[in-house]
């Protein structure tokens, strides 16, 4: 068998090849008129790939499916167990087998909002270390709001000519302002909607870059943490 040069290139450690980074974000979710329906997948993929490039960890791509709480009705999602059994587990098993991955960071860009509590069981079943990175969700703010549009500017996926159409009466998913069931079921969603109602959408490339950089650095930190955990 060929001996691989694991320390070659700009990598933080030869062992970093044992760590994978997997993106998880919805491809089929309305984000108002200024952002595409696969915004979550693109943001999560960008963050995951950039962290991979800066550390040398393996980029494992993006999961095709996404799950969401049943009261959030702004896109097409699948059941949590279907995503877990049909998408997430097979990808991680194949990465473990084909790439000798012993650990992974899952970058959640709103594609796995019901999966975080499954991580411990997932680690036991797959016999690998996993960190669930939720930084994008934590910092980008209301759905299809200023934060996401600002990040979209940096990625080149935002259409600023349509900002004038960003009205919740036309696109109820903006800030989830018009998603009454979701607002009634989840105080956090209602709080974010109230912020968006009050402040509107104010795109800012500086904010967008800051959000992306923060998320990338968070994933890099997780990669370093996993390296310390590996035998």
UniProtKB/Swiss-Prot annotation:
HAMAP family cross-referenced by the UniProt entry: FAPy_deform (MF_02116)
InterPro entries according to UniProt: Creatininase-like_sf, Creatininase/forma_Hydrolase, FAPy_deformylase
Bilayer-spanning residue ranges: none
Cofactor note: Requires one Fe(2+) ion for activity.
Name of this protein: 2-amino-5-formylamino-6-ribosylaminopyrimidin-4(3H)-one 5'-monophosphate deformylase
Catalytic reaction(s) noted: 2-amino-5-formylamino-6-(5-phospho-D-ribosylamino)pyrimidin-4(3H)-one + H2O = 2,5-diamino-6-(1-D-ribosylamino)pyrimidin-4(3H)-one 5'-phosphate + formate + H(+)
Any one Gene Ontology BP term: F420-0 metabolic process
Pfam entry (one): Creatininase
Function description: Catalyzes the hydrolysis of the formamide of 2-amino-5-formylamino-6-ribosylamino-4(3H)-pyrimidinone 5'-monophosphate (FAPy) to form 2,5-diamino-6-ribosylamino-4(3H)-pyrimidinone 5'-phosphate (APy).
Presence of the UniProt keyword Hydrolase in the record: yes
Binding site for Fe cation 1: 29, 40, 110
């Amino acid at each position: 068998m060929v001996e691989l040069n694991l320390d070659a290139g700009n990598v933080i450690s030869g062992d970093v090849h044992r760590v994978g980074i997997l993106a998880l974000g919805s491809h089929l979710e309305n984000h108002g008129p200024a952002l595409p329906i696969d915004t979550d997948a693109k943001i999560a993929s960008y963050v995951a790939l950039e962290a991979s490039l800066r550390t040398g960890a393996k980029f494992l791509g993006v999961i095709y499916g996404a799950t969401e709480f049943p009261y959030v009705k702004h896109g097409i999602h699948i059941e949590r167990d279907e995503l877990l059994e049909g998408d997430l587990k097979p990808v991680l098993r194949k990465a473990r087998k084909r790439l000798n991955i012993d650990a992974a960071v899952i970058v959640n860009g709103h594609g796995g909002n019901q999966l975080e509590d499954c991580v411990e069981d997932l680690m036991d079943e797959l016999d690998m270390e996993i960190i669930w990175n939720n930084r994008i969700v934590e910092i980008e703010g209301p759905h299809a709001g200023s934060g996401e549009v600002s990040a979209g500017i940096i990625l080149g996926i935002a259409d600023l000519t349509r900002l004038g159409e960003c009205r919740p009466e036309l696109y109820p998913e903006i800030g989830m302002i018009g998603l009454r069931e979701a607002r009634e079921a989840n105080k956090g969603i209602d709080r974010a909607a109230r912020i968006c109602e009050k402040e509107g959408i104010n795109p800012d490339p500086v904010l967008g870059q800051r959000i992306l950089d923060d998320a990338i650095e968070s994933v890099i930190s997780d990669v370093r943490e996993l390296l310390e955990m590996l035998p």
